[in-house]
């Protein structure tokens, strides 16, 4: 089974959060979303 490494997986999460923040114009919440995504990645792996 192919499993992407932690760094590439985290990078996709960060990019998704940045795009989501731009489209929703929630600039203040982007940092908190990144922290949440980082915690999610830790729990996934």
From Swiss-Prot:
Highest taxon listed in the record's lineage: Eukaryota
Membrane topology: Single-pass membrane protein
Location(s) in or outside the cell: Membrane
Entry's Gene Ontology cellular component terms: membrane
TM annotation in the entry: 10-27
Keywords linked to the UniProt accession: Membrane, Transmembrane, Transmembrane helix
Annotated protein name in UniProt: Putative uncharacterized transmembrane protein DDB_G0281023
Lineage: Eukaryota, Amoebozoa, Evosea, Eumycetozoa, Dictyostelia
């Amino acid at each position: 089974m192919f499993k992407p490494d932690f760094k590439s997986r985290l990078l996709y999460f960060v990019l998704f959060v940045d795009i989501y923040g731009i489209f929703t114009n929630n600039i203040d919440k982007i940092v908190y979303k990144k922290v949440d995504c980082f915690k999610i990645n830790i729990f996934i792996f």
